[in-house]
């Protein structure tokens, strides 16, 4: 797993793209809990999202799970590949399985996210 990722308690990951945008997806742990992903309900470009509120839905053979935005901002890109290949969320959650890119309203929100090493330690304790 990449060390530059940050996480939420609800198992979303965030990559700071360094240009005022972040890429968001669900963690390897989350996709493992969900099982085989069969559908991803993507947000729309230009949708406004609020930190902690649902903005996407991932359906698996076991369950449907809301995906919560880790940050407040505007959707600038969605991963349309997931419409035809939702299994990428399982196969490469941190690479081709990303869900959306968000233009940050407030970059200081990134400071409240969980560093990758702390996140991994919290999983070990479960």
Curated annotation (Swiss-Prot):
Keywords, A to Z, come to: Lipoyl
Gene Ontology CC, one term: cytosol
What is written in the cofactor note of this entry? Binds 1 lipoyl cofactor covalently.
Q: Could you tell me which Pfam families the record lists for this protein?
A: GCV_H
Matching entries from InterPro entries are given as:
2-oxoA_DH_lipoyl-BS (IPR003016), Biotin_lipoyl (IPR000089), GCV_H (IPR002930), GCV_H/Fam206 (IPR033753), GCV_H_sub (IPR017453), Single_hybrid_motif (IPR011053)
Methyltransferase listed as a keyword: no
Reading the lineage from the top rank, the first entry is Bacteria
* Positions of modified residues (N6-lipoyllysine): 62
Q: Which cofactor does it need?
A: (R)-lipoate
Keyword flag Nucleotide-binding:
no
Domain (Lipoyl-binding): give its ranges.
21-103
Report quaternary structure and partners: The glycine cleavage system is composed of four proteins: P, T, L and H.
PANTHER family per record: GLYCINE CLEAVAGE SYSTEM H PROTEIN (PTHR11715), GLYCINE CLEAVAGE SYSTEM H PROTEIN-RELATED (PTHR11715:SF3)
Biological role: The glycine cleavage system catalyzes the degradation of glycine. The H protein shuttles the methylamine group of glycine from the P protein to the T protein.
Record's family? Belongs to the GcvH family.
Protein name per UniProt: Glycine cleavage system H protein
Name its species: Aliivibrio fischeri (strain MJ11)
């Amino acid at each position: 797993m990449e060390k530059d990722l940050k996480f939420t308690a609800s198992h979303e990951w965030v990559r700071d793209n360094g240009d005022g945008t972040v890429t968001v997806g669900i963690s390897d742990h989350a996709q493992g809990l969900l099982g085989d992903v069969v559908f991803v309900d993507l947000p729309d470009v230009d949708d406004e999202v609020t930190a902690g509120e649902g903005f996407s839905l991932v359906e698996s053979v076991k369950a449907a799970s809301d995906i919560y935005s880790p940050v407040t901002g505007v959707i600038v890109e969605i991963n349309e590949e997931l419409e035809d290949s939702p299994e990428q969320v399982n196969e490469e959650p941190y690479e081709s399985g990303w869900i959306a890119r968000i233009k940050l309203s407030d970059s200081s929100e990134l400071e409240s996210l969980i560093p990758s090493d702390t996140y991994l330690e919290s999983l070990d304790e479960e």
